[in-house]
Amino acid sequence: SKMAVMVTGIPEGKQVQLKIMAWWTGKEGNNFDGGNPNQKTYTLQNGFNLIDYDYTYEGLAYVSYYDAHPETMPELTVHFVNGIVNGYLSPDKTNQEMYDLCAKAPNLHMDCWGNKVHSVWTSNGLKKYCKDVNGNPKGYRQFMNVLDSLIAWEHRSLGFEKYDRLPNTRSFAYVNYTYYMFQGGYGVSFHHNQEQRVLSCKTLITNDDDAIWGLSHEWGHQHQMQPYFCWGGLGEVSNNVQSYYNITHM
């Protein structure tokens, strides 16, 4: 399919890309078949852009616009002329609004854009399983707060708060179709058949230390910055400090 994208505001000499991620690639199996999404990358320019997306499965579009000093960069305006709007979940929406987005989502997957964590799950899984700590449906805001808290606690245990080095970025989590849990090329990943556990605030907060351990352990790999928290022979050990710390807090 072809999509028209209009862009304004790209600074001269700055590269901005459109990345279309097909989180479902038609594979479900072992040996990491279905373990990672298919990514198509297109360079954007000011004005008219014709995006020729030729992958078999539909994807979600993300604008990649980075700089070492983002506060100095101008905002972009990006208009998908004939794109289909999937929407995304974020704390500024009500739980009902987010439920409706999941129920009507044209894509198999949905983005959750928290304050410290960006995650992607199946739209149906979010609609069915994302309940609050009391078991009530529509626990989206609380769910994003739980994930944000896990990252905030990891940053605290690493001294980022104490030394005023908190990153202004988001950690990532996404659903996969091959394996229970792993740290993938993009972030922490859980198999789609685990969504009943990892999307439920009641389960995460009250009775599933393994899920908290897994999220914290795998995100802990991202925080193993040599030589500060990653030493020889301890690649699967030092990050368990985050797991213990987060389970204790939760």
Task: Identify what each model region corresponds to.
Residues 41, 49-51, 100, 107, ...:
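Short, flexible coil/linker segments at or flanking structured domains
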Residues 43-46, 93-95, 100-103, 151-157:
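Short amphipathic alpha-helical surface micro-motifs
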Residues 1-88:
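Beta-strand-enriched, solvent-exposed domains that form extended recognition/catalytic surfaces
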Residues 2, 12-14, 19, 27, ...:
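Context-gated lysine
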Residues 8-9, 65-67, 93, 195-196, ...:
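Short, motif-level signal for alpha-helix interfacial/capping segments enriched in acidic residues
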Residues 99, 108-250:
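Catalytic cores of extracellular degradative/oxidative enzymes
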Residues 77-111:
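Low-complexity, Pro/Ser/Thr- and charge-rich linker/hinge segments at domain boundaries
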